Amino acid sequence: MAKRNAVVVTHTRLRQTGTVVAEAVSQLRVAGFEVAIIDNTEAPDFGVQPPCVSDDTEIVVVLGGDGTILRAAELVHCTQVPILGVNMGHVGFLAEFESFQIDEAIRRVSTHDYSIDERMIAHVDVWLPGATKPIEDWALNDITLERADRGKMVELSIRVDDVEMNSFGADGVIVSTPTGSTAYAFSAGGPVMWPNVKALQLIPLAAHALFARPLIIGSGSTFTIDILDDSMSEGWICCDGRRQRALPQGTRVMVRESRDTLRLARLSGVPFTNRLVSKFDLPVVGWREHARNEASSQSLHHGHTFPAAAYAAGVAVAGDAGVAGTEPDKPGERDGKAGS
C-alpha cells in the first residue's frame, strides 16, 4: 500500500491547550496517514518563498481560523496540495468545517470524498528605484500599500494597463482578490466579489480626493501603483498581513493575476452565497419587513381599510405625517453583526 502523507497546521497556543489537535492527528493516523505537525510558522521576509510541503503530501489539514489558513497557504504555494480548513477561530470564512465536525472531516478526507475549489492568487512585482529586476511575491487575500509614516500621507499614482486613472494622497490602497474581498477590503468599503469572478479590486484608504473610488479590473489587466518622488511618506507593502517591507519614494508596484492558484478542499456543496449570509450573520430581514408584518393583518384608519400591499408599497395614509411603515433600526437594534 502506498504511503499517505498529511500535514496538520495549527498554532502553538491551540496545540498546547486543546485536545482537538491530538484528536485530529490520532484519527488521521488511524486512517493510514503519516502525519507531520506544524504549529509555529513565522512570517518569511517579503519576496522570500518559505519551504513548501513535499509534493507527495496528500492534504494539509488546518486547525485554526482564517489567519492560520493564510499561513498554511505559504506552505503549499506553487504545489498542487489542497488545504482543508477546520475553523477554531471566529468567522472562519475559508474553513470548511467547524471544530465539532472534526470526525466527519477526517473520515471524508480518508476516503477522498471531497472536491477542489481553486482560488485565484494575486502576483505582485515591486520595482525599487534603479532596480534591474523586481522583487516578486503573491497574496491569497490582499496586498496593501500603506504609508510608512503614520503622521503623513503617501502620494500615489494609480494606473490600469499603463493608463493613469488617478493620483492622490492617502493612507494607502488595498488590492484584493475575490477571496480577500470579504476581509480588509470589505471593511474598507469594497464590494464582495464571488470566488468564481476572475478579477482584482483596488480600494483607496482615506484618499484625499473627490473621486477616489474602488476599481475592479479583469484577470488580464494589471494595477500599477507608483509612490511619487515627492511623497511626504515612504510606503509599506504587506501581503496577506504577513510578508512585508518598506518601500522608498519612486517605487513601482504592479499587481496582476498569478498563474498559480490555491486549492481548497470542499466537502459540501454549500454555495458561496449561503456561506456569505451565514458567516457574516447578515440581517436579511430589514426594517421594511417589519412594516409588512404589521400591515399583514390590515390596518383600519379613519374608517378605511388599507391592504397590506399598500403598506409594503409605502403608500401615505391620510392623517399620518409620513408613509406607512416603521422607522429604520436604531444603532444596536439590527439583527446580526458586522463582518469580521
Swiss-Prot record:
- Catalytic positions? 66
One GO CC annotation, please? Answer: cytoplasm
Q: What's its catalytic activity?
A: NAD(+) + ATP = ADP + NADP(+) + H(+)
Q: Where is this region: Disordered?
A: 321-340
Q: Name one GO molecular function term.
A: ATP binding
Q: What does the record list as GO biological process?
A: NAD metabolic process; NADP biosynthetic process
Primary localization class, coarse:
cytoplasm
Q: In this record, what's one Pfam family?
A: NAD_kinase_C
Query: Which annotated residues bind NAD(+)?
Result: 66-67, 71, 141-142, 152, 171, 182-187, 206
Keywords of the record, alphabetical order, are: ATP-binding, Cytoplasm, Kinase, NAD, NADP, Nucleotide-binding, Transferase
Localization terms from the record: Cytoplasm
Annotated EC:
2.7.1.23
Q: Where is the composition biased (Basic and acidic residues)?
A: 327-340
Q: Which cofactor does it need?
A: a divalent metal cation
Would the keyword tRNA processing turn up in this protein's UniProt record? no
Entry-linked PANTHER family: NAD KINASE
Tell me the protein family, please. Belongs to the NAD kinase family.
| Role, per record | Involved in the regulation of the intracellular balance of NAD and NADP, and is a key enzyme in the biosynthesis of NADP. Catalyzes specifically the phosphorylation on 2'-hydroxyl of the adenosine moiety of NAD to yield NADP.
Spell out the HAMAP family in the cross-references. Answer: NAD_kinase (MF_00361)
The name of this protein is NAD kinase
